Amino acid sequence: AYRFLWSHPTIIDSVWNSLLLAFASATIVMLLTSVVCWIVVKTRLPGRWLLDNIASLPLVFPGLVLGLAVMVFYLNFNIGIYGTLWIMLVVYVTRFMPYGMRYNSTSMLQIHKELEESAQMSGADWFTTFRRILLPLLKPGLLAGWIYVFIVSIRELSASILLYSPGNEVVSIVIWELWENGQFVELSALGVVFILALLALVMLAQYMGRRFGVKEI
């Protein structure tokens, strides 16, 4: 059964697709929400809290509903990403953005405004201040959020099942297909490997937490 896993091209491709999507979605989510959280927490722009509400809106919808909405939208507006990994990346980023907001907003609230003001008085522009002052201070929250989004992206199924196409399967889709086809021996083998991989990610998260001072992940 385990030899079947390593010799089956669809399974190998699904592993790479899952890793690529998880890495990209975690990175985009954490960087994008760090900017949104700065606007919400550190500025006095009118309606800034509306951004927080919009970013948290995907929590209201199940993944299946969100996937269906994205599918209908991109079928009506043919942009050329339907049936590719790009549309799955759009859904992943949208669905997991609320988690990035929670991690980043908690960290952003702990950064004193005086640090930004001191940088600005020294002649630093906004981008330099954000890159050299805020991002290093946000590192524990960014790291914790990145690992969490990476893990939940790896196991995402409900939205992916509506948006994948042949050749763009992810691991969760392959597990579902093995179940549907009655290949329970191969399913069990892949499930064991999948659980061990997730366990390794959790252990890595705990190590990184101790290494960089993240208390909870």
Predicted regions and their residues:
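Transmembrane alpha-helices
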Residues: 57, 61, 94, 101-104, ...
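Membrane-interfacial helix termini and adjacent extracytoplasmic/periplasmic loops
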Residues: 43, 47-51, 64-97, 127, ...
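C-terminal transmembrane helix and the adjacent membrane-cytosol boundary/short C-terminal tail
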Residues: 39-40, 47, 105-116, 120, ...
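Transmembrane alpha-helix signature in integral membrane proteins
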Residues: 9-40, 47
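Membrane-embedded alpha-helices of multi-pass transport/permease systems
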Residues: 31-35, 68, 94-116, 154, ...
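Interhelical loop and adjacent transmembrane-helix boundary motif
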Residues: 1-10, 154, 160-206
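Hydrophobic transmembrane alpha-helices
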Residues: 54-61, 87-97, 147-154, 164-166, ...
